[in-house]
Amino acid sequence: MASKASSLGSVSTGNFTPAPPKKGALSGTKEFLESNSIVAKIAFLLLVLIAFIIILRLGIQIISYFMAPSSSPTVLSGMTDANHMHIIPQNPALPHSIPILRSINQQDGIEFTWGVWTFIKNLKPENRYKHVFHKGNNKVDNDLGMNFPNNAPGLYIAPHTNNFVIVMNTFDKIKEEIIVEDIPLNKWICVIIRVENHNLDVYINGVIVKRHVLASVPKQNYGDVYVSMNGGYNGYTSTLKYWNTALDVSQIQRFVNAGPDLAMKEKDMTQSEPRYFSLRWFFQNPEMDYGGL
């Protein structure tokens, strides 16, 4: 029986070798990475480098968004006695610094805007300027009352008058002055100083009252911001703000509508004073110069 052959033929009893599995995407990638081809290695390194650059740029943008100084910081918050001096450092390494970003030159040239609220109680007859604020160095002439040489810009009250004097440095002239006359007392007044290319515009409570064409390009500086130097003036200063662009009319009006920040530690009756003055001032002031507007 054991020697009988099957009618279907003999069956081999040798070793059976299974067919190798088909290579999929993973095995193909492995072969690609393990190959000795220089082209394959260079291509892989390029892919890694591109991915690293993309991730790095995204990371820098995210960090800059959260860590970079604001382009429109509030330099002085709340209401302060205008007889008390404040210094706002520009060195980011110093505590309580509020860096002012220089203007980003647009198609029309350099541009930036400063805004501040002032409340002038009364003016004593003095032979020197009264300091509201300026950005620059710390060298006020005690007799004159004006800082020199850096004012970019500077806002002062002229001697023996209730006139505002705006001072701006340019590359051709160390000091250019713009005068706004007959500022009312005992009223909150919003002063906007707007620079666009060679034009310096002054707005009082949202209305343009002066346009001055500067002799040359405005000269910004890296100096600190000073408020109420040399005794300041008798009154209050509130909400000093900077923008590194030239505000449009709607943005200026939005700042005016927000009003002064009256938050102050000591209580004061100025919160009950009228915020604005009569429109009659705009129409009865014959010295207004709109620069051809």
Model-derived features: positions:
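Extracellular glycan-associated modules
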Residues: 1-293
